[in-house]
Amino acid sequence: MRVLHVCSELFPLLKTGGLADVVGALPAAQIAEGADVRVMLPGFPDLRRGIPDTVLVREIDTFAGRVSLRYGHYQGIGIYLIDAPGLYDRAGSPYHDQSLHAYADNYRRFALLGWMACELACGLDGYWRPEVVHAHDWHAGLACAYLAARGRPARSVFTVHNLAYQGLFSGHHLAEIQLPAAFFQMYGLEFYGQISYLKAGLFFADHVTTVSPTYAKEITQPAFGYGMEGLLQERASQGRLTGILNGVDSDIWDPQTDTLLHARYDAEDLQKKAVNKTHLQTTMGLEVTEKKPIFAVVSRLTEQKGLDLVLEALPDLLQLGGQLAVLGAGDAILQEAFLAAAADYSGQVGVQIGYHEAFSHRIIAGADVILVPSRFEPCGLTQLYGLKYGTLPLVRHTGGLADTVVDCALENLADGSASGFVFDECDAQALVRAIRRAFVLWSRPKHWRHVQRHAMGLDFGWQVAAADYLSLYRRL
C-alpha cells in the first residue's frame, strides 16, 4: 500500500511540538509493517538543509507561482519537498515572524501544501502515486478538500493532533487557492464566515483520527470541540472517527541507549538514574540531595498545559520537601512567574526558558516525577517519556493522559498496574492532593521502585499504532 503523509514538521529537522515527533516515527514504523510510505513537506530552510540531496520531480505552475517538487531521502524515508522560496524560505518559526505574528500569507503557504499533495495523487510524479493521503493538522487540512474537488483520486485520512489550532482565514481567498465556491458553506469548510483548514480536513476526509481514544470521545463534546463538536459527533456516529494512541520512538527515547544522558540505565540498574539526578540538580542550581524528589515540567508554558496550577501548588510542593525543575517557553506571563519563583525559592526551583532537545532528555532522566496537569491533552508524549525513563507521571485525567497513566491508588498498587499519579478536577487543590500522594509513595522507596519498574516495562512503541493505521487504510 502506497501512503503519503502530508505535514509541516519532521523530527529532528524541524520541531515546534509533538506533531514533528509523530511524523518522525510513524512512517518508519509503517514501512517496517510492509507499507510503501513517503512524506510531503514545505521546503522550509531547516528541512532543505537536513535533506540536501534531492532530485527534481517536476516544475509546475500553481496559484502561488512557479513551484518545484523535489524528492530525497531522510533516514530511509522518501521525502517530497515543495521548493517555493518566496513562501517558505524564512528564518525561524515556520508559522510566524520574530514578533510572533502569524505570516499574512499562511493561507497561501499551507493551501499549496494541500494542493501539491492532491497533484501527487493525480499523477504529478510519474513513478509513484499514493493510494492513501494522510494529512496532519490544519496545515495539511486542505489536501482532503482538494482531493474531494478532484473526484477523490486517493483515499484520505485526517489526523487531529490538537483541535485548538484551526487555521482560520478570510473567505475571500477561496478563489485564489482554487477551491470550488460551493465548498464555502456549513457543509464544507466554512466556519463562522471564514475558511477553516482544520474543518476542511474534518469534513472532506474519508476518515478522521485523533491521537488517543479518550480525546476522540472528548472532542465530540462542547467543552473540547471548539465549535466542531457537531461535525465530530456526526463522524463518530458514521464510524468515521477513531482514536489511535501515539507511540514513543525507542531509537530516540530509551534510557539504556540514550547518549544524551550523563549515565544510561535500565529498570534493573536504577542507581545510575540517581547520577542523572545529581547532574540535573547541579545544572539547575538546586540543592544536591537524593532525599528530595524533583518534580519536572518539560512543556510549552501555556494555560492549556495547566502550568498556572503548578505555580499555585508550588508552595505546597516545596513545603512537603520537593524541588521543581522547569524547561519550556511560551506565554510571557507564565515565563516571568516561573523565573520569579526560581528567584524566590533559590536552590529549590530551577527554570530554563527555551526548548533544548538534549536537555529535555536529561531533565526527564534526572527528575523523579514529570508534571503534566493539562486542561486538555490530545495525546501527550512527555508522560510516555516519563514512563520509559522511570520518572513517574503526575497527570490530569484527560485525553491521552487518561489512556496511558494508571493512578497509584491502593487497588492499583495491589494488582501491580499503577504507573503514576492521576487527578480529575482542573484546580490547584486537586493537583496538591495528587502531589501529596506522590510524597506518600516517595516515603516508601520499595514501593516507589516497584512502580518505576512497572512503568519502564510498559510498551508504547509505534508498532501498534502503525498496524492500526494500516488496518484503517485498508478499510477505506
Swiss-Prot record:
> Which residues participate in ADP-alpha-D-glucose binding?
K15
Instruction: Write out the pathway annotation from the protein's UniProt entry.
Output: Glycan biosynthesis; glycogen biosynthesis
Q: Which keywords, in A-to-Z order, does the entry hold?
A: Glycogen biosynthesis, Glycosyltransferase, Transferase
Q: Which InterPro entries does its entry note? A: Glyco_trans_1, GS/SS, Starch_synth_cat_dom
Gene Ontology cellular component list = cytosol
The keyword Oxidoreductase appears for this protein: no
Show the catalytic activity. [(1->4)-alpha-D-glucosyl](n) + ADP-alpha-D-glucose = [(1->4)-alpha-D-glucosyl](n+1) + ADP + H(+)
Extract the Gene3D superfamilies matched here: Glycogen Phosphorylase B
Q: Which Pfam families match?
A: Glyco_transf_5, Glycos_transf_1
Kindly report, in one word, the top-level EC class recorded for this enzyme. Answer: transferase
HAMAP family membership:
Glycogen_synth
Q: In which family does this protein belong, per the annotation?
A: Belongs to the glycosyltransferase 1 family. Bacterial/plant glycogen synthase subfamily.
Protein name (Swiss-Prot/TrEMBL): Glycogen synthase
Organism from which the protein derives: Yersinia enterocolitica serotype O:8 / biotype 1B (strain NCTC 13174 / 8081)
Q: What is the lineage of its organism?
A: Bacteria, Pseudomonadati, Pseudomonadota, Gammaproteobacteria, Enterobacterales
